[in-house]
Amino acid sequence: KDFDGKKLKCCTKEGLDIHHSEEAKKDFETLKAEYEGLCKVIKDVLHKKVEKVVVGQRITDSPCVLVTSEFGWSANMERIMKAQALRDNSMTSYMLSKKIMEINARHPIISALKQKADADKSDKTVKYLIWLLFDTSLLTSGFALEEPTTFSKRIHRMIKLGLSIDEEENNDIDLPPLEETVDATDSKMEEVD
């Protein structure tokens, strides 16, 4: 696949090579070394959901993105193949390879997450944030959520956290009383002969 003497490459797959100056390459190598610990923490939390976590240079606005392996299916192809009625399940499981998470080390969310993870790797909030980032990057990268209910629970938990609502607080909602049951003797229904 060539165009005008240049090789075309899918930007949603791993191995996208963006040509930069020597100084930019050195800066990127420094960032990779600095964020290696966070990449390991994210990989440990996501475990089998991602093949690896790397510092990427393809994104500028998002905190992270999910890409597929060089020979795996893209997000759109994955969606098409899942919709096939007569699909080959053995081929599907093979081609649905694990995703690769690329983090944007220059994004403020990733920087703050790194500080929080460096302070305490076992913090529950760090784990929730990592899962939330994974789920949102699934959506922004074009993949389907595997567990939408779990995703919405994570969102609700973060909203509670943002609104300073205590997680342990008992959330008894006042429900209207149930309709009273009527005895058979007090029934006002017509009797049938």
Curated annotation (Swiss-Prot):
GO terms for molecular function: ATP binding; ATP hydrolysis activity; ATP-dependent protein folding chaperone; unfolded protein binding. A motif (TPR repeat-binding) lies at residues 189-193. It is found in: Cytoplasm. Disulfide bonds: none annotated. Gene3D superfamilies: Heat shock protein 90, C-terminal domain (1.20.120.790). SUPFAM superfamilies: HSP90 C-terminal domain (SSF110942). Its main location: cytoplasm. Residues 171-193 are annotated as: Disordered. Coiled coil: none annotated. GO terms for cellular component: cytoplasm. It comes from the Eukaryota. PANTHER family: HEAT SHOCK PROTEIN 90 FAMILY MEMBER. Homodimer. The TPR repeat-binding motif mediates interaction with TPR repeat-containing proteins. Belongs to the heat shock protein 90 family. This is Heat shock 90 kDa protein homolog. It comes from Plasmodium falciparum (isolate Palo Alto / Uganda).
